[in-house]
Amino acid sequence: MSEEAKKRIQLALALAVVVAGVRAGYILYQRHEEYLAAQKLEQAKRAGYSNPDYYVQPKKLYPYDLKSARQLTQQPVWVKEGYRYTYYAYDPARKRTDFAHEAGLLLPIERLEIKDVVTAFPPGADQRRQLMAVFQKEGKSYAVPIGFEPVGEFKIYSDEMFYVEDPHDLYKHWPADIWQAIEQHQVKPGMNEMQADFAVGMGVPDAGRSDEKTVRYPNGGKPLVVTYQGGKAIEIKAGS
């Protein structure tokens, strides 16, 4: 066997060891996260929390590379925080994301069908490679960042962005009038913060007292200010 062939075999074996190590690390991480979720649920039960939301454990995919991130194509996803994530026009023929022009923001609890997960480099020599989820909207293709590659290893945050189970099923214990307000993108007195997030997207809390909380919602250009007391909305007014 030639020296070149030996080097190729050694390189292939080394690569296989690295891949196996990454996979093993991912499995351990996934099991650790599942263990923490189970512990959190058990603690909630022991504390006797009456809020059923504490017992909801949304499924996570724990993606760690391009291949595992493509699990997003296997089921619909729903946006967790509306008006937070910017998406861009995507050319599927050229596999190119138009980072120069923002196409919009993902909406609250918007349902998406992820068609593919690809990589892309934004303009600029110092920009890091981005991981993009490709979807269609009104017949056009778009891509939204779901992670990046700082130094040879992806940091993927799609589990923080999307539900992979229908929120209507996860939170089926919510009353029908709450879901109706959410679908109409309205915040009503008595809603909790999660329900308000579902209705009008991400909010930014003010610093203040622990027993009373004020949260400001950009709401896609129609700002709202909501005051919560005891975890429930007591005042809703237009923001500025």
How would you label these PLM feature ranges?
Residues 1-7:
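Short, Lys/Arg-rich N-terminal segment immediately upstream of the first membrane anchor
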Residues 28-31, 120, 126-128, 172-240:
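A cross-family detector of function-defining hotspots
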Residues 97-123:
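Conserved beta-strand/loop element in small beta-rich adapter and peptidoglycan-binding domains
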Residues 10-27:
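Hydrophobic membrane-insertion alpha-helices, especially the h-region
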Residues 37-97, 161:
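SH3-family beta-barrel domains
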Residues 47-49, 121-141:
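Basic/aromatic-rich interaction segments and small domains that mediate binding to polyanionic partners
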Residues 24-36:
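Hydrophobic single-pass membrane-insertion segments
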Residues 133-171:
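Boundary regions of SH3-family modules and the immediately adjacent low-complexity/disordered segments
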